[in-house]
Amino acid sequence: MFRRKRTMSNVKEIIESGKAYLGIEFGSTRIKAVLIDEEHNPIASGSHTWENRYENGLWTYSLDDIWAGLQDSYRDMAENVQKEYGVTIKKLGAIGFSAMMHGYMAFDKEGKLLAPFQTWRNSNTGKASEVLVDLFQYNIPLRWSIAHLYQCILDKEDHVKDIAFTTTLAGYIHWQMTGEKVLGVGDASGMFPIDMNTKDYDEEMIQKFDKLIEGENYPWKIKEILPKVLVAGDAAGILTEEGAKKLDPTGNLEAGIPLCPPEGDAGTGMVATNSVAQRTSNISAGTSFFSMVVLEKPLKDLHTEIDMVTTPDGSLVAMVHSNNGTTDLNAWVNLFKEFADSIGADVDMNQMYGTLYNKALEGDADCGGILSYGNYAGEPITNVEKGRPMVVRTPETKFNLANFMRSHLYTALGVIKVGMDILTKDEGVEIDTVLGHGGLFKTKGVGQKILADAINTPVVVMETAGEGGPWGMAILAEYMVKREEGEKLEDYLKNKVFGSDAGSRIDPDPEGVAGYEAFMETYKKGLDVERRACVDL
């Protein structure tokens, strides 16, 4: 992926001359800072572990948690630079901040937080979401910022009249660093719907929302309190003296460093996997799964199963999210490991995964009739309310290890398949390639083949499968400074970041495609059994 490796003296010179780029991302359990050189290589990182709190019925992080975590992740990175290269960071080429999207942060005209920060995990916005979906004829998920704001209005919360600014976590940090009330279009698309032609909030929906709440007589209109939307490559302000001290309380970091538009974790993930071009997709397959498909044009119909966001440069993205992923698969692998230990077999977990996953490829294309569900949590897309892992078979089922493992790999992708079918079959969306990343793809070629057959599309897996969100954010910071006039983000990534790293590609196999379709027919029929288990068991 990266162009060339640097010597230690090269890196020291880059850092001292202020030519390194910094990306910091707030994940739900970890805040990570990644420093890269001019060739996009990560040269240092730092992190801070944190946890959300459940207070007064809401998931939140306190402002103290936010600032302590930011400073600690930066300090950890800076100390690693000092230890590794013997240099103190004073200047940087550019900085970018990213964070988990959505949620609710509302401030008054003095900059005071009016209500506790509500994270994306809060689902107390059902009524608001329902009203807004009906009003806009556009999917507004429970976690979106506009749903949180409208729920506060429905609940007659007193603070709403005093709102002067509402933003996301990344937008808040950026504002405190620069004084600029701006947001990258990808993160903004999780606050309020975006018009892909103007790369700004959808004007028709803005007017509909203002009309919806005009009887409340608030002293603001919705666009007045939302952040200004910027796209990747736009200048988004410079680090102020106050901002520098908030990031680095030691005082070593100097003011005046340019910042790029703050982004959401979905956007940085797309950058890190080289998946921002139209007709491309990336699928993350870990403890939960999600797929993101970059569209050429808006969808024809409203689909509540599909979330609409954008790339950092403003292309429309259809996102399918599955609450469940590899957890049930892992449980079965652990069970077989326990059996191996019980008979005295010396097998490590890598060998166990490799053996069982590869065994799945020996199974029948339709799993021999075995049906399984790996739901550890509820699944809105399939209307399953609770976690009920299940294996079902008939007396005629070909019950063997290969079919058993294959069924569990198949079902792990079941919800993603339902969502992708809406896009490709119902909406006619065309996808050239999918980039797969995450735990499902660690055993070479297995998860990749199953996914290619499931969605009938070529799947590429890179050796690194991307360096993660904070690295993607650092790339966006660098792109703002180093892009040529008119150079698109997708071209910058393709030609200057990822270069010749095309990864390994597996094309769908007609027999496998037909087998997966047969499995999905049974999967859909069996969902009533799964739903009944949520009630009776």
What positions do the PLM features span?
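A generic structural motif
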Residues: T49-W50, W120, N323
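Conserved small-residue
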Residues: A33-L35, H40, I95, N122, ...
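Active-site core segments that coordinate phosphate-bearing ligands/cofactors
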Residues: S9-S17, L22-G23, I89, K127-L183, ...
